[in-house]
Amino acid sequence: MQIDVDPQEDPQNAPDVNYVVENPTLDLEQYAASYSGLMRIERLQFIADRCPPLRVEALKMALSFVQRTFNVDMYEEIHRKLSEATRELQNAPDAIPESGVEPPPLDTAWVEATRKKALLKLEKLDTDLKNYKGNSIKESIRRGHDDLGDHYLDCGDLSNALKCYSRARDYCTSAKHVINMCLNVIKVSVYLQNWSHVLSYVSKAESTPEIAEQRGERDSQTQAILTKLKCAAGLAELAARKYKQAAKCFLLASFDHCDFPELLSPSNVAVYGGLCALATFDRQELQRNVISSSSFKLFLELEPQVRDIIFKFYESKYASCLKMLDEMKDNLLLDMYLAPHVRTLYTQIRNRALIQYFSPYVSADMHKMAAAFNTTVAALEDELTQVILEGLINARIDSHSKILYARDVDQRSTTFEKSLLMGKEFQRRAKAMILRAAVLRNQIHVKSPPREGSQGELTPANSQSRMSTNM
């Protein structure tokens, strides 16, 4: 029997969109304190949309935080949601009368005053920028664009904020200014979830001399910048479902320099990096890059549950590992960046556990295997069928005896293939050595053009000698 599976129609690849969390164990105040600015408000709104028990509390906190900004439109939207949530709570059949259930009234005086303040500040910043342009002072113009971008961001106008931050690029006079511009653009692009833009500006920042030319020990400021860039790149790779790349990015973050509350917290780095690594790393990579990583261990100390899951997985204690994963699933579904990937990551982690369990054996008793994974034999058989169809395990199932058999590999053919590949590699190296010897014997030197010099002129310093060799 042959089964064709269309990867685009595979439910495991579909993002988790329609879900409701009824039993959260999240400390909302502690959670919100880990973030700042728009990210704090966005995350609280995400929790309110998907967790009825925390909806009113999350919206009240978001309403309080948004009043510290100029974002009047978001204030009105959150207030509307809070009023609806409160009415639903009061009309619930099992509702208990409580004091303080009524939402605070819409503060129209604050709305009008804030709108006027925002408009006055915008006019002042715009006038200042015009004056700077009239004086043709690059540094002042750059700061003027940044100030305008900050103001638009505070007002919730992300498109104009992005334009202002991007315009500052033409007035950057040092690598430090370019990096600052890139970080501003990256931050707004994350809010807009424009992930290709995020990766583009991460690459631009990493290619500046201040970052690219440093080797060995980096100073504290450079480490802080690199950590921000790696965290932003990790979010972009996670959104693109490139989990292995995302894990590598998060693993490169420095714990002592992880201070980016506008986007994510150190706890997020531990959870995102840990789960992506579990889903994609093999046993050796997990041991080398996660368990033995002195830097990432510090992140894992903030999330003991994730740390224990990784160690249980590495120790092949799959039942307890998968049980702990299920226990923290509700909280993960309340994370706005991780939630769409929870089901896929969990499936990949479980599949990797099945592969790791079976890899040393020629055959395995499915009854014992089901006990090890805390599941039924029938459910395990369905899982193994899917894993075999995807080509993750080269095996066959004896449904009558409930035994999983590894398919025999033709060792003779494999040895011949390896020998041929090795011969081709030796041949390539021998040709390269002969070419190098010929170049040295004939004293041929290829000089690169100098970094600084007149363009378009051919001088002896940047002329090149070439030799074509027909091997």
Swiss-Prot record:
<feature type="modified residue" description="Phosphoserine">
    <location>
        <position position="448"/>
    </location>
</feature>
<feature type="modified residue" description="Phosphoserine">
    <location>
        <position position="463"/>
    </location>
</feature>
<dbReference type="InterPro" id="IPR019585">
    <property type="entry name" value="Rpn7/CSN1"/>
</dbReference>
<dbReference type="GO" id="GO:0005634">
    <property type="term" value="C:nucleus"/>
</dbReference>
<dbReference type="InterPro" id="IPR048624">
    <property type="entry name" value="CSN1_C"/>
</dbReference>
<feature type="region of interest" description="Disordered">
    <location>
        <begin position="445"/>
        <end position="471"/>
    </location>
</feature>
<keyword id="KW-0539">Nucleus</keyword>
<dbReference type="GO" id="GO:0005737">
    <property type="term" value="C:cytoplasm"/>
</dbReference>
<keyword id="KW-0736">Signalosome</keyword>
<dbReference type="Pfam" id="PF10602">
    <property type="entry name" value="RPN7"/>
</dbReference>
<dbReference type="GO" id="GO:0000338">
    <property type="term" value="P:protein deneddylation"/>
</dbReference>
<protein>
    <recommendedName>
        <fullName>COP9 signalosome complex subunit 1</fullName>
    </recommendedName>
</protein>
<dbReference type="GO" id="GO:0008180">
    <property type="term" value="C:COP9 signalosome"/>
</dbReference>
<comment type="similarity">
    <text>Belongs to the CSN1 family.</text>
</comment>
<dbReference type="Pfam" id="PF01399">
    <property type="entry name" value="PCI"/>
</dbReference>
<feature type="domain" description="PCI">
    <location>
        <begin position="249"/>
        <end position="411"/>
    </location>
</feature>
<dbReference type="InterPro" id="IPR045135">
    <property type="entry name" value="Rpn7_N"/>
</dbReference>
<keyword id="KW-0597">Phosphoprotein</keyword>
<feature type="compositionally biased region" description="Polar residues">
    <location>
        <begin position="456"/>
        <end position="471"/>
    </location>
</feature>
<comment type="function">
    <text>Essential component of the COP9 signalosome complex (CSN), a complex involved in various cellular and developmental processes. The CSN complex is an essential regulator of the ubiquitin (Ubl) conjugation pathway by mediating the deneddylation of the cullin subunits of SCF-type E3 ligase complexes, leading to decrease the Ubl ligase activity of SCF-type complexes such as SCF, CSA or DDB2. The complex is also involved in phosphorylation of p53/TP53, c-jun/JUN, IkappaBalpha/NFKBIA, ITPK1 and IRF8/ICSBP, possibly via its association with CK2 and PKD kinases.</text>
</comment>
<feature type="modified residue" description="Phosphothreonine">
    <location>
        <position position="459"/>
    </location>
</feature>
<feature type="modified residue" description="Phosphoserine">
    <location>
        <position position="454"/>
    </location>
</feature>
<dbReference type="InterPro" id="IPR000717">
    <property type="entry name" value="PCI_dom"/>
</dbReference>
<dbReference type="InterPro" id="IPR036390">
    <property type="entry name" value="WH_DNA-bd_sf"/>
</dbReference>
<dbReference type="Pfam" id="PF21151">
    <property type="entry name" value="CSN1_C"/>
</dbReference>
<keyword id="KW-0963">Cytoplasm</keyword>
<comment type="subunit">
    <text>Component of the CSN complex, composed of COPS1/GPS1, COPS2, COPS3, COPS4, COPS5, COPS6, COPS7 (COPS7A or COPS7B), COPS8 and COPS9. In the complex, it probably interacts directly with COPS2, COPS3, COPS4 and COPS5. Interacts directly with inositol kinase ITPK1. Interacts with CAPN8. Interacts with USP48. Interacts with ASB4; this interaction negatively regulates GPS1.</text>
</comment>
